[in-house]
Structures are given as structure tokens and as C-alpha cells.
Amino acid sequence: MAAKLLDDAGIDVRVLINDADDPIAEHSVLGRFTHVRHAADAADGAELVLVLGGDGTFLRAADMAHAVDLPVLGINLGHVGFLAEWESDSLEEALKRVIDRDYRIEDRMTLTVVVLDGGGEEIGRGWALNEVSIENLNRRGVLDATLEVDARPVASFGCDGVLISTPTGSTAYAFSAGGPVLWPELDAILVVPNNAHALFTKPLVVSPKSTVAVESNSDTSAAMAVMDGFRPIPMPPGSRVEVTRGERPVRWVRLDSSPFTDRLVSKLRLPVTGWRGPQKQAENKDPRSAG
């Protein structure tokens, strides 16, 4: 439906080969559109990346869009869909806004992730929109780690892992691990030890100018740094991960002008019964706000 509406409006729709070759897509309207094999070909001359799916789909599309500096618009087909801008039941309205260029672009902070071996040599590099999770390679046993901020040690502990997150990622894995929610307008790096066995295991909110590092203290157990849940970098015993603010943000297509607070309450279904704030009183006095 989305591709057809855009095509009817005279907009060139490009479909990656992997999507077009899907058995369902083979017998659908997707077969009509330009098929490209590489993301760079799809991005050539494009205005934005349209994502239909849940948060996992959005993160994979953001990986492609980030590489070519294109804005991303997410339409939620999943459950919570925190990263999506719009719900699927309003798809037609969202596409009309895209066709009319009635949207704005918001930059979301990213992380640069560098993995170094025990001798200080770089052995891997990547980036994350949500978070990087440092954990045991086989995901069994305890990760023996030391947390470091700006070249100074903070704490050593055994844990299931250490999460280093952006404000955008604070509502994802870091939130499930007990971290706070950071508003996306805030520039900060969030550090959340995951099930740490130590006295000091509280989440930390660190300056975006800082370098956060996690060292693996084991001489025998390998670890891995997993970015956004699907881009792993192996870490040999004794290696470390250094995380800084990314140089390039992800460009987010915004259609909705409502504040993040409303989004948080709606997506997490937070109870706000009994609220009597000034805005609520103003809404009650304005008959146009009813319904």
C-alpha cells in the first residue's frame, strides 16, 4: 500500500533486492518497482528512507540510512515501536505528509565504538544508535569488567554485561536493565551495568564529551561488543571497548509535534489518572481539545 501510494504521487520507489525477493512480495505490488541490490544504489538521489516494521527493522534501516546520511521515517507495525514516528493505522496520512514535504528533521545522537586488543591495537570499529552491549562471547558465565571514564577507573565488577547507551536507546535494552529514561534532546552518554555483582552498580549519566571504556579483565574468556542488537565485534581476552559520541547523527523524520513526554506515557502505557496540571485545566476549558 505504501509503495503504491507513493508511486501514484509520482515518487520513485526503490526496493532492496532482499525485500523484493520475499515470497510474499513476489506476488504483490512490490514487483512493479525499481529493484536495487545495494543500499548505496537505493540512496542515490533519494530524499528519505521509509521503514515499515518494529524497532528491530528500524535499527537495520537506520544502519543503511546512516551510511548515506539520509533521514529515516518509521511506521510502526510492531508492538511498542518506540523508534517509529507514526502508527500503521494512519499510514495514508503519514505518506501524504511525506509527499507534501510536510515534515521536519531531528538529529539523534549516535555512539562511535572502537575495540582494542590487550596491546592497544584497534581490531574493530562500529557505531550505534541505541546502545552497545559488552558481554561474554558465549553469553554464559560472568563478564569480569572494569568501567573507565576519561581514562580514570570507576569500578570493577562481575556482571552479565555493560550497556552504553544514547538518550534514544535509554528506552530500550538499558531501560530493561534498570537504567533511567533520558529525553532525546539531552546530550549525554548513559552507562548501565547489567546484573552486576558489586556494591556500586548504579547507572551513570556521563558527559557527551567523555570517553567511556570497558575493559575485559579475563585472560581466558572472550567477549563481544554488540551494537544495536545485531552488529557484533568479537573481543579477545584482555581487550577493551572505547565509546565516544558519534560524529554523524541519525536524521529522524518528525511528523508529530507532541512532546517526548506524551510519547513516553503512550508507548509505555504509564498511569496518569488524577493529573490536574495547568495544561490539563486549559484543555478542559477549551472545547476544541475534547476527543
Curated annotation (Swiss-Prot):
Per the record, what are the reactions this protein catalyses? Answer: NAD(+) + ATP = ADP + NADP(+) + H(+)
Q: Which GO terms describe its cellular component?
A: cytoplasm
Keywords (A to Z) from UniProt: ATP-binding, Cytoplasm, Kinase, NAD, NADP, Nucleotide-binding, Transferase
Main EC class of this protein?
A: transferase
Write out the GO biological process terms: NAD metabolic process; NADP biosynthetic process
Cellular location(s): Cytoplasm
Spell out the catalytic residues: D55 (proton acceptor)
Q: What is its EC number?
A: 2.7.1.23
HAMAP family linked to this entry: NAD_kinase
Functionally, this protein is described as follows: Involved in the regulation of the intracellular balance of NAD and NADP, and is a key enzyme in the biosynthesis of NADP. Catalyzes specifically the phosphorylation on 2'-hydroxyl of the adenosine moiety of NAD to yield NADP.
Q: Which family does it belong to?
A: Belongs to the NAD kinase family.
The name of this protein is NAD kinase
User: What is this protein's gene name?
Assistant: nadK
